[in-house]
Structures are given as structure tokens and as C-alpha cells.
Amino acid sequence: MSSKRFLSPWKNSLEKPVIYHCVSRVVDRRFVLKEEEREKFRMFMRMVENFSGCRVLSYCLMSNHFHILLEVPPAPAEGVSDGEILRRLGAIYSEAAVAAIAREMEEARAEGAEALLGEIRLRHTRRMHDLSEFMKALLIRFTRWFNRTHQRTGTLWEDRFKSVIVESGLAARTMAAYIDLNPVRAGMVEDPAEYRWSSYGEAVGGGKKGNGKKAREGLVRANRCDKGVGFDATQWLEVAKSYRILL
């Protein structure tokens, strides 16, 4: 279900993040992703994003496939702290599950079992800052929900997801726009701002907080990553003007 189609020359680099355009299609390309499914998919996407440390720059959820422009940053050289591991786990696990992991870590620490503590950390951090792990977690979580909801079994996605590396700068801006224009090309809307299951639609209509803020941060990063700009939603109004022209 999950594989990297092209490996970046910066993979595991401590200097430069990698941007991927990821695509996956429903098996037989059936049109099964309706409103409820797209809302749930977006929810899982944000959950996995918050856990993994990867960031969604742009996305579009269609009726039988999706596009995600994903930035995969290098793992921090100093590692991920125990507190940060637990905070991120809270994005995908229940409070009870996170508390159990915290107790497991504390017991190992109290016993001076550094090797065991390292294994516990690695069990979770190996799933962070990694394209395949991000996609695996997202697709599996959504498939489980979809199969349970629709009383079905088996795979939902057609073959393996596809991914290609996108350079920062014009290539990243152009790819973000290409993704946001999917519903326009499909004749579903005339204005990409009207399509709520896309990064641009969410950035315009989602407000200044929550996922609306996340969408704005991602598009600011996609448009200005070559200038060293991070995920800064305060620059959205300025970026939105130039991005709208690109659209």
C-alpha cells in the first residue's frame, strides 16, 4: 500500500526537507468518496500530520482519488524529546493509551533501563518524518473506518500510492495550484475557492483558526519555501493575492 517511487538525494539529510506530490486512487476508480468520506479523510490526514511531523502544503480530495503535496522534514539531530513524543501520540491515540505509554517510559527510566527506554522511543519515532509511514498510517486508518462504515472488507486503494519529488520555488507553487485546480478541471466548480475539500477552499473558507489556519500555513509554505518562509499564516493575505493569479 505504501512505497516511495523516487528517493530524494536529501533523504535523512539534516539540512533540507523534501517535498513530495502524492496520489492514490480508489480500486477500480469507483466514485465512493462522498461528502462524509472526504470529511473523515481530511480528519485522519490532519491527525497523522500532527503526529508525524510531516506537513501538508496542499491537498485535494476528489470522488475517487486524492492529491497531497507533503513536506517531509529531516528528523531533528537532537532527537525527539519524550514530552514531544507523548504530545504527538495524543493526535492519534486516546488519552488512556498515551498515559499507558507514559507510564511505560517512566518505569523504564526509574529502573535505569536505558536500552528499553530507547526501544520504546524508537517504536514511535520511526513512524515520524517519513513519507511511507505517513501514507501508510493515513490509508490504513481511513480504510478501516470506510470498511467498518460500509460493512465491507478488503483493500480500498488501487495498487500503491505514487509519489514524485517536487523542488521548492516555482515547481512547488505550480504543483500546489495544479492540485487545487482539480475540481475546476473536473467541472465540479468554476472557482477553486468553492471546493471545500481542497487546501485553497479550506484556506479561504475555513477561518483563521484550526484547519483553516493549517491550510493557510501550508499554502504560504508552498509559495515561499524557496525564500526561507516557514508555516506562517500571518502572510496568507499577501500570498493569497499572488496565488490567486496563479490559479
Task: Label each PLM-derived region with a short phrase.
Residues M1-L247:
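Short catalytic/metal-binding and nucleic-acid-binding patches
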